[in-house]
Amino acid sequence: MNNTEYYERLGVDKNASQDEIKKAYRKMSKKYHPDLNKEEGAEEKYKEVQEAYETLSDEQKRAAYDQYGEAGANGGFGGGGFGGASGFSGFGGGSGGFGGFEDIFSSFFGGGGAQVNPNAPRQGDDLQYRINLKFEEAIFGVEKQVKYNREELCHTCGGSGAKAGTHPETCHKCGGRGQINVVRDTPLGRMQTQVTCDVCNGTGKEIKEKCETCHGSGHEKVAHTVKVTVPAGVETGQKMRLQGQGDAGVNGGPYGDLYVVFQVEASDKFERDGAEIYYKMPMDFVQAALGDEIEVPTVHGNVKLKIPAGTQTGANFRLKGKGAPKLRGSGNGDQYVIINIVTPKNLNQAQKEALQAFAKASGVEVSGSGKKGFFDKFK
């Protein structure tokens, strides 16, 4: 099982930081971009670089890849997701993989680790929400209203879980500790250990009369709306943390956080790689042969570009500062214009005669379809 191949594709060490991974990705992506590199195999290399970055730029996928290889990164050993079409989910706890001595002793003793005060304040769960952005919204930034359900303190009992006029009492079985002592027979003999109290479920409190609204949980699901200011230059997969916008805490603990994950739609005109933008510019072969000044679309509006005589298909020109804003830094990236020369179809008689005259002047014999033609001279 090779769990270093993705790092090798980007040319980074397995302990590389996210900034190092991103920098390496942009370098390799530009090196093998099919519009800039016409060598055989470049497009396949480009796809491999994209695949590696998609995994290594996501901390959860990267951790799975480091442990299990490509199968782990692709969800072969379980996984999460965005929780369905709503684009919303909570962050669950737990862990996978293979245990060691801790698992063995846990099976004997019913658990392990330090005791936790059941009455101590605990922060609420973090939540995740996916926002879909149009290409231009990601470039220039936008404000979005995000509406989702989260757990808040019950408006009836104020979070106590008890019916109005009553209060939670100290658990009669565990005395408020949340745990009880039990004696078990193990292969090592009879041993005493601590387990979660089966009466209060570890809370240390006992609710005799439960709140009719929350049924004793102290929380209720509430529709919540928050304004998200999306910064200019975000990309697919990047996250924004909104502190205190997650689920309500326990025992007076703070609210969890909301993590907004961005998903950017593709453009029908441009391709984007970080702060750099690529545009394929169709051009008449006469313009390419003679040279011309053309008007090129950019995300910032149309600009003039001088094309020298003799320009070939695949030639690229840089428009400095006409790319996307740099999310971490100042200024914009660049736009690359890739020339695509268009061969005319359905020529009229005057056009045919003009080309035939040019062919004759160039010493090229044009004798019909399937034989050596005008453009063969330039191959």
From Swiss-Prot:
UniProt keyword annotation of Repeat present: yes
GO function terms (MF aspect): ATP binding; heat shock protein binding; unfolded protein binding; zinc ion binding
Renumbered zinc finger spans (CR-type): 141-223
Necessary cofactors: Zn(2+)
Annotated J domain residues: 5-69
Note on cofactor: Binds 2 Zn(2+) ions per monomer.
Subcellular localization, as worded in the UniProt entry: Cytoplasm
GO biological process: chaperone cofactor-dependent protein refolding; DNA replication; protein refolding; response to heat
GO cellular component: cytoplasm
Function description: Participates actively in the response to hyperosmotic and heat shock by preventing the aggregation of stress-denatured proteins and by disaggregating proteins, also in an autonomous, DnaK-independent fashion. Unfolded proteins bind initially to DnaJ; upon interaction with the DnaJ-bound protein, DnaK hydrolyzes its bound ATP, resulting in the formation of a stable complex. GrpE releases ADP from DnaK; ATP binding to DnaK triggers the release of the substrate protein, thus completing the reaction cycle.
Domain notes: The J domain is necessary and sufficient to stimulate DnaK ATPase activity. Zinc center 1 plays an important role in the autonomous, DnaK-independent chaperone activity of DnaJ. Zinc center 2 is essential for interaction with DnaK and for DnaJ activity.
Entry-linked HAMAP family: DnaJ
Protein name per its UniProtKB record: Chaperone protein DnaJ
Phylogenetic classification of the source organism: Bacteria, Bacillati, Bacillota, Bacilli, Lactobacillales
